[in-house]
Amino acid sequence: MSSALSLTPSAVSAPTRLRLPDLLHTTDRFADDVLRGRFTRLLPPGGFPADSRWFARLHSDDELDVWLINWKPGLSTELHDHGGSLGALTVISGELREQRWDGHRMRSRRLAAGDQAAFPLGWVHDVAGDALSVHAYSPPLTAMSYYAVTADQRLRRTRTELTDASAGG
């Protein structure tokens, strides 16, 4: 059995009643709440760390997790999926660079302040940048797999990690 995968984003139904447009609306609403100061109490007292990604959970229930993430230049998430969860993000400030696997090769896009992105099941990407963003996952993340692209342009899963409820996605 080969460990190389040929994953493509698909319209596979998710184990949640929420859909991608719902998650985009959620990240937009929470981004507005962050800008209005609703979550100031969650921000680090001395400002965001200079050398690491920072995150805080803004909301959690049985079908939805919402995170605020501060990204630092030079740090990336590595190429990963979101297990059995759908995802979405809204960039509040700065810019994120997303490298995603389209089933055949890597594609790149930049997301600036105000931009949104949605992640269906099977979405494999790497995110980096210097930004503040809100992310929503439904159902809440329980596992993430990490990948490498092989010389023959296939995905190879390198590891799968269970997510820690306290460690943002």
Segments (PLM) and residue ranges:
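Conserved short histidine dyad/triad with adjacent acidic residue
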Residues: 67-82, 111, 120-122
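Double-stranded beta-helix
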Residues: 130-169
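Short beta-strand His + acidic residue motifs that chelate non-heme Fe in jelly-roll/DSBH
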Residues: 78-80, 98-99, 124-130, 135
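Short acidic-glycine-tyrosine-enriched beta hairpin
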Residues: 88, 100-129, 159
